[in-house]
Amino acid sequence: MTHEEHHAAKTLGIGKAIAVLTSGGDAQGMNAAVRAVVRVGIFTGARVFFVHEGYQGLVDGGEHIREATWESVSMMLQLGGTVIGSARCKDFREREGRLRAAHNLVKRGITNLCVIGGDGSLTGADTFRSEWSDLLNDLQKDGKITAEEATKSSYLNIVGLVGSIDNDFCGTDMTIGTDSALHRIVEIVDAITTTAQSHQRTFVLEVMGRHCGYLALVTSLSCGADWVFIPECPPDDDWEEHLCRRLSETRTRGSRLNIIIVAEGAIDKNGKPITSEDIKNLVVKRLGYDTRVTVLGHVQRGGTPSAFDRILGSRMGVEAVMALLEGTPDTPACVVSLSGNQAVRLPLMECVQVTKDVTKAMDEKRFDEAIKLRGRSFMNNWEVYKLLAHVRPPVSKGGLHTVAVMNVGAPAAGMNAAVRSTVRIGLIQGNRVLVVHDGFEGLAKGQIEEAGWSYVGGWTGQGGSKLGTKRTLPKKNLEQISANITKFNIQGLVIIGGFEAYTGGLELMEGRKQFDELCIPFVVIPATVSNNVPGSDFSIGADTALNTICTTCDRIKQSAAGTKRRVFIIETMGGYCGYLATMAGLAAGADAAYIFEEPFTIRDLQVNVEHLVQKMKTTVKRGLVLRNEKCNENYTTDFIFNLYSEEGKGIFDSRKNVLGHMQQGGSPTPFDRNFATKMGAKAMNWMSGKIKESYRNGRIFANTPDSGCVLGMRKRALVFQPVTELKDQTDFEHRIPKEQWWLKLRPILKILAKYEIDLDTSDHAHLEHISRKRSGEAAV
């Protein structure tokens, strides 16, 4: 990349103006997106305007369209809803309203519009764009604008960001607000679970989603619900019978509660609505269970945005500004989407079309097609839900094959959800499943027992590791481990854990030369708060830790805002891996995040202090600095604290906080529960296939590299990679992968904290096409 290109980003917006508006229903994380659009816009040299109250503000103009400053978006990252207001607008649907809106934009020289809202809002924006030249002609004819103004504003660029808690927009894996809505729902389900267990009750929970069952579906996976009703997939005609049988079977197996999740738009095969009251009456009448209905309503839109939504909003906001400023009269209006963990640009109308196709397919009762059109992520969730909730657990003892499940390393939230799904999918496939306590140590000592269906009941929402986990590696106990593999007839091993699980896997591979017993398939599921396992972009537990850090930073920032002129230095966990410090820095709006992967010197520390001195002269009189625990052996948290205290004398005072082990605890977030459940199911499916493949002469013999894998999320898919192949990609001394995707997000953190840096624009998303993406072809 040339030096000139490097500097291009800083001057990309000179002479241009961007307006940002939020429209339709509010969603948590919209503020993060607005903040990013404003700050990155200003960084590129553009002028940025807030449009208050959505399209209504665009039509009314005047005070509703105000120029934004760097400081005007301060302290809004952690607020729910939308600070600039949103409104449903009838005027904008009429051409007359759009004419007034065009007039307001032209008069201010605004030719770039960033719309944050649902599919209705984005369709409105596209209509506005397609009529733009006609609207300008009319305004010129009426003498409202001059020919010169019309030429200056000859075309309108539009970029959409999807903000909707329902996740009902096709083309993006997640919309802004969905993850936070899931947080609210799961908090409530966890609270209801305790009261339901006390009274042996059945609860029917109604969640939002008139045309989309995403929230209901993911909630049911995240809390192990007995049944879910979603509009995309109505139940069979005899569902009443099936539901009641399922509820009574669960009770017979010793469960004290039943949970049924209903999307507000749930229907049966004939398109007749299924309401929560209908379900309650059915259960009471047929089974006589004490049943309660809870309608969650607008609680789901409220509260603080989750770390995921803040990062998503920020990334999307940056990408939106780049898309607007790079736009030409020929580029179609696009929407910035998320695919796996990649930001992509898709043509707005293609996405809107597919979204409409889903509704059409549902209206025409083509339900299988509706699920396919919803995309890969939705289909995966549906398949796993069907397996875990609707397949009857086998009654017979002694299965096809014997698979053992264990936890290795430090505890991470979501480990139990992974164990539960692994055990249950294993049982469904007819295997005998064993659980190993205390990691490789327990495997050597024979702390192994058989797990039945109800052994893992209610595990999804529990933090920590119920099996017990140790950091001990297998190398020194290979003999005892081999003996126990034979003794318990273990034919496959699922290892859920952190970097030790991965190195343990490598040691088992090495040990195969010495011990034939180790020639069994094994799979490592990455689970660690540090997110430092090679072969996966995410590991189970990191999202929960991130949210814990975020909540703490919010409270600390609040304290600093009250005291004024105070800088907090916060130490996060993660070993040598800077994932938590970087992502929490992005989500909490930190001024700097020190990490091992990006070496820093005393000069860098000095620059940061000078930066904070400048900041104290503005209206924002507080600072937040994150430091990864092992980022530098000499520049410790105490050293940085002392340096800041000395250099900031008379200007600001400093405080330090070491967050410590609270980052490993807590109830798992919806993301970690869902991710763990899917990973467990995927791993067990792979395992069953591998065992069959390795069956020779009456026994299992697996000695090929692909019989020992790490299951990881890579960009857009879950993939199995042999541990031996990942060896070259690993820095063993510092226990981190050599290449890490999230390092590309570091510049965003710095720009949003007002550092004058070069932004490499070569890595920005390119326009792709939604239909091609579906069929799995490469991006255009």
UniProtKB/Swiss-Prot annotation:
Beta-D-fructose 2,6-bisphosphate binds at residues 471, 528-532, 566, 573-575, 629, 655, 661-664, 735. InterPro entries: 6-Pfructokinase_euk (IPR009161), ATP_PFK (IPR022953), PFK_vert-type (IPR041914), Phosphofructokinase_CS (IPR015912), Phosphofructokinase_dom (IPR000023), PKF_sf (IPR035966). It catalyses: beta-D-fructose 6-phosphate + ATP = beta-D-fructose 1,6-bisphosphate + ADP + H(+). Residues 2-390 are annotated as: N-terminal catalytic PFK domain 1. The modification Phosphoserine is found at residues 133, 377, 667, 775. It comes from the Eukaryota. The modification N-acetylthreonine is found at residue 2. It comes from Mus musculus. Its EC number is 2.7.1.11. Allosterically activated by ADP, AMP, or fructose 2,6-bisphosphate, and allosterically inhibited by ATP or citrate. Its cofactor is Mg(2+). Glycans are attached at residue 530. This is ATP-dependent 6-phosphofructokinase, muscle type. The gene is Pfkm. Residues 402-780 are annotated as: C-terminal regulatory PFK domain 2.
